[in-house]
Amino acid sequence: MNSEIELFKKNKKGSDKWVKLICGASNEDIVAIEDLSAIYSAAGVDYIDVAADESIVEAARNGIKWAKKLYGASPGLMISISDGKDIHFRKAKFDPLKCPSNCPRPCERICPTFAIDYSGVKENKCYGCGRCINSCPLNLISEYEYKLSNNDLPKTLQTIKPDAVEIHTEINRLDSFIQVANILKTSGIEFKKISVSCGLNQSQKGPKDLLKALWDRYEILVEHNVPLIWQLDGRPMSGDLAPSTGKDTVKLWNNIGSHLPPGLIQLAGGTNEKTHEFLKINNFPDGIAFGSSARKIMQPLIEDANKNNKKLYEYPEKMDLAIKKAQKLLNPWKIS
């Protein structure tokens, strides 16, 4: 396994880094996901991470096929799963009949995916960022869980056959992590990579506790003989899109990066176009994952195309613009 990791690193030329697009573990917007997958595949991402759902995976693969045909780009496909309750696996809801007629509707304005209108929350467009929950002056918005059960996971894996899987976990959830890891091991799927995503924001623990938790999970996964990725989730699902949000994951990297188990090390959680500026030039991790920031810059273009019942990649000029926007985000991590 370690030799495969080293081979991957050697094949990444110069300062080129591993980059992943996060479409959202509870994002069901298949129209946007197809366009996002096409855009970021063409721009040069290494993997695309989507919800564990057959229709969503099909949309992502369609986007990848488009990019492969025109650009020769074919990133791997990863699905996100969880070993327990997790804020990445949620959606928002409210009863629109309870909204006062004179409400300024801050929830609608703040939603990055345009998932809210007078009918409430469009379930397929909501990916659970939580921004609307905090914005409602009457506290009418709540959340509910959107998660694949362990009972359904084996069948889903066989149907989708993803290239990779990411397990979202928490420091104190080792037993449930073992259960999920065993399902992966007995699935019969030859995964190219297994990613473990964990951070501190959902616990009262410190960096040393996180480090121990990741080593515990390494001892479990090392038997799988699959290259591993350790995703340091600095600011998971905060809903905050400010440039400084990437500081939390960089802080985690600085604290424990050199002591992590063997595998690729990836930053996530609040990452954006400014994150690389918070890193020391001679101390970059193996890669980065972009979620909300990557989707936000494309959403207006995708929505505009969708108004005409078309995909963005059916408009060559607009697609060229989208790819350039994506490349600008990726360039600090990829060879320009």
Could you say what each language-model-derived stretch is?
Residues 1-24:
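N-terminal amphipathic alpha-helix/helix-capping segment at the start of soluble metabolic enzymes
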Residues 7, 54-85, 135, 181-195, ...:
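Alpha-helix-loop-beta-strand connector modules within alpha/beta enzyme cores
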Residues 16-32, 82-101, 124, 140-150:
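Active-site mouth loops of central-metabolism enzymes
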Residues 23-28, 32-34, 45-46, 52, ...:
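Conserved mixed alpha/beta catalytic, RNA-binding, or beta-rich assembly cores of soluble enzyme
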Residues 40, 60, 165:
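Conserved, mostly hydrophobic/aromatic
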Residues 41, 100, 108, 112, ...:
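Non-catalytic positions within long, well-ordered alpha-helices that form the structural scaffold/packing
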Residues 46-114:
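A broadly conserved sequence feature marking short terminus-proximal activation segments
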Residues 104-122, 131-148:
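Iron-sulfur cluster-binding cysteine motifs and their immediate structural context
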